[in-house]
Amino acid sequence: SHRGFANLPPGVLVYAVEGPFFFGAVETFERTLAATHTDPRVLIIRLRWVPFIDITGLQTLEEVVGDLHKRGVTVLLSGANERVLGKLRRAGIVAQVGEENVFGDVAAALQAATVAAR
């Protein structure tokens, strides 16, 4: 969902994943991204409300990030808890997005996104 981010810089989109990132949530995530039609320059995937992520979530995230990168979209991750971040590291997703594109909170990610979208 993108609620609460009315004043996003041009070219920046925030997608908040809410709840466990597993099989059911993955379909919604993919559908929502497909529905945007125009690619943002920067997509912030906000993981603050994700208590855990399973293998399906990890695989989907990896595929989505790869697809977005091919389309020239910079992907930033924000707010993942230690457990989720550990899984993202082990799955190679942190390396895929780049350590410099992982942020503790959405405010820091938005600052970086504003610069990256220019």
Q: What is each stretch, according to the model?
A:
Residues S1-R118:
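Structured cytosolic domains appended to multi-pass membrane proteins
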